[in-house]
Regions:
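Hydrolase active-site cap/lid region
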Residues: 157-209, 267, 272
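Alpha/beta-hydrolase fold nucleophile elbow
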Residues: 137-149
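Conserved alpha/beta-hydrolase "acid-adjacent" motif
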Residues: 236-242
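Short beta-strand/loop motif that positions the catalytic acidic residue
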Residues: 222-223, 229-231, 235
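Alpha/beta-hydrolase active-site loop
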Residues: 84, 115-136
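Conserved alpha/beta-hydrolase
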Residues: 91-111
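Catalytic active-site module of serine/aspartate enzymes centered on a nucleophile-bearing elbow/loop
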Residues: 270-286
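An N-terminal hydrophobic leader/cap segment in hydrolases
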Residues: 2-50, 60
Length: 286
């Protein structure tokens, strides 16, 4: 394919994606169906609470046993839902932890919005943590957050702005939104030197944040609680090198890296390989 044709097709694609309707489609993923706690034999309370912009979030809450006790918010990735992370709920609850499985805006059963983004995931996570700490079954001094993919990056961002978490866990988190977007642009064969940089600036304006201000490699050194980076060595979407980059940027923060050999980006069958290291970390931190 000639360079001229690549540019022409890229321009047509950009016109579709970056028009207001295209941006809404791009940043409002289709909602993933899933199972419920009942189907897995978990007794969960169906709850909802407010987030920003007058929206409401849906979640499943499993109280700690015994209560009051420690508890964690679990946040899914892009285009996923709380249902996708239900396999983590059982081992967490067996360890005596309360679990709040959250649907971010535009995902699962939560309210829609004009778009979703990693900073909005972090906003929703903040509201979920505040709701969790107010529950009488929860010890508010022993709370943590676990996130996958975009949710993992949101955990790092939220944890960098809070001083009331005992632990944070980011599974398959990307190190920098720009790196993630460049990989995405490459998949569409959009030439970065010619058009890609403009796309990234346009998206920054659309979401209201500069990538450098919200990147994990920028904010990780501000985290005041222990952070676990769990990452599959065979992740095809967010390379393992991203986890190493976050670790290298940690400064004085307490950060541990848990490589999961042979694990991809988040296949359910890989959860058993994540659980031992996750539970060891949480038992020490909480």
């Amino acid at each position: 394919m000639t360079t001229g044709l690549v540019i022409l097709l890229s321009l047509l694609l950009l016109a579709a994606l970056l028009a207001p309707a295209g941006l809404r489609r791009l940043f409002r993923p289709s909602r993933a169906p899933g199972t419920s706690p009942d189907e897995l034999g978990l007794a969960a309370e169906d709850v909802s609470f407010a987030t920003v912009r007058g929206k409401r979030l849906s979640a499943w809450f499993i109280a700690p046993d015994p209560a009051p006790g420690p508890a964690v918010v679990v946040l899914h990735g892009w285009g996923s839902s709380a249902a996708e992370l239900l396999p983590l709920a059982a081992p967490l609850h067996r360890a005596g932890l309360g679990v709040l499985l959250l649907d971010a805006r535009c995902h699962g059963r939560s309210d829609d919005d004009d778009f979703a983004s990693m900073p909005r995931f972090a906003e929703d996570l903040d509201h979920a943590l505040d709701w969790l700490k107010a529950r009488p079954e929860v010890d508010p001094t022993r709370t943590a957050a676990i996130g996958h993919s975009v949710g993992g990056a949101a955990v790092i961002l939220a944890a960098s702005r809070r001083d009331d978490l005992r632990a944070a866990v980011a599974v398959a988190a990307f190190a920098h939104p720009r790196w993630m977007m460049r990989r995405w642009l490459g998949a569409f064969r959009i030439p970065y030197p010619i058009l890609g940089w403009w796309v990234l600036r346009h998206v920054e304006r659309a979401i209201g944040h500069r990538y450098d201000d919200i990147a994990a490699v920028t904010v990780v050194d501000r985290i005041r609680c222990p952070l676990l980076l769990a990452h599959g060595t065979d992740d095809p979407q967010v390379p393992f090198a991203d986890a190493r980059a976050i670790l290298a940027a940690r400064g004085g923060a307490s950060v541990e890296l848990l490589p999961i050999d042979g694990f991809g980006h988040g296949e359910p069958e890989g959860v058993p390989r994540l659980v031992p290291g996750l539970m060891d970390f949480l038992s020490r931190a909480l």
